[in-house]
Amino acid sequence: MTYVFPETIAAQATPSGRGGIGVVRVSGEKTKAIAQKILGCVPKPRYATFVKFRDSGSVIDEGIALYFPKPNSFTGEDVLELHGHGGPVVMDRLLNTVLKAGARQARPGEFSERAFLNNKIDLAQAEAVADLINASSEQAARSAMRSLQGEFSKRIHQLVDALIQLRMYIEASIDFPEEEIDFLADERIKETLENLTHQVQEIEKTAKQGALLREGITVVIAGEPNVGKSSLLNLLSGQETAIVTDIAGTTRDIIRESIHIDGLPIHVVDTAGLRLTEDVVEKEGVRRTQKAVQQADLLLLMIDASKPTEDFKKIIAQWFSENDNKIPTLIVENKIDLIGEAPRKENKEYPHIKLSVKTRAGVELLKNHLKNTAGFEATHENNFIARRRHCDAIARASAFLKNANNHLLNQKAGELVAEDLKLAQNALSEITGEFTSDDLLGKIFSEFCIGK
């Protein structure tokens, strides 16, 4: 069944700016009437038709029109796409003509929202549309495409169906107590519940990988002036992002650069050198450094390996006495080329990596540590893209299933087991949108671009 929305919507579906082609998309009950006004006809469904786009008889542009009648369209409504020349003036005139003919400007994500409400895609697939557009690596794009094609949703639906079947079986033992069968003592219930718990734990691991592909981790490089922080940023990013000189205090502000290591997005933050200073600008840089550190997933505390050992022990002790030591920290001992040491990793109170940014010795050790800290598996080919809300929902489902196991094995409490299964089912159904609040839907679709 197609949901009938009272308003027809329109938006430019291609990015703003100059381009060879620009597309205006229309969806809703007035689509055919709008086509008749602007094109003088309703194009043959699913055929590219070359036409002139007119406003009150005056030709605005000429190009290709594509018409998709309901319900076999992206939104499930009548959809019209007008492909014209991609100049901003032309696109503005064409969109304004469509709006004047009876449509209104679409909100961000409103086309995808209508597709979801008309059961053309589920919520996880709708989110995958945005994730595919925003993918920052080839691996993220492939994973988003798998989600868009429904692989993630299929696994969630299979789990939900299995939970429903098990819950029905357990509820039967509650509703028909006169039957002389102890359903809860049935070994198959125990095995099924254990199997479902394991499956949810496995999909939780995969979802975490998908969330890492989408969001990555934030790594902050901090330390005293002139220890090689900016040089490390330049080395990791592969370009001269930060100015590097022998003068202490060159970096006075936060410098951010996004890189990829085997598909893992890493947001690297280079910071001002930490030292006592009377310079007002440098003081502000130090303050921003301390703020950036609090938002880090991993801190790289850089020190100069060529200095006496007691000096950098004092630096490390002072740092952790003044800052939150709950943030995962790696001590990076740079400039080992000056003292003739080989690169290596040491696991002390805090892990240490000895390297030389100048010679690149030990840099692979650092990259591997970044991936391991994030829990990233670069060779995981069956990843789907995931969001934090997906991970949260799966984690809640996993917790409910653990409760169900406890209630089954230790208390033989059928009612509690059934309730745990229902809660796990609802948590998983939030992912595909079958059990979702309107507030969450509004938040999700508001993050889309206009025209999608």
Swiss-Prot record:
Domain of life: Bacteria
InterPro entries: G_TrmE, GTP-bd, GTP-bd_TrmE_N, GTPase_MnmE, MnmE_dom2, MnmE_helical, P-loop_NTPase, Small_GTP-bd
SUPFAM superfamilies with a match to the protein in the record: P-loop containing nucleoside triphosphate hydrolases, TrmE connector domain
Compartment list: Cytoplasm
Keywords, ordered alphabetically: Cytoplasm, GTP-binding, Hydrolase, Magnesium, Metal-binding, Nucleotide-binding, Potassium, tRNA processing
GO CC, any one term: cytoplasm
EC number annotated for this UniProt entry: 3.6.-.-
Family: Belongs to the TRAFAC class TrmE-Era-EngA-EngB-Septin-like GTPase superfamily. TrmE GTPase family.
Name the UniProt record assigns to this protein: tRNA modification GTPase MnmE
UniProt lineage: Bacteria, Pseudomonadati, Pseudomonadota, Gammaproteobacteria, Legionellales
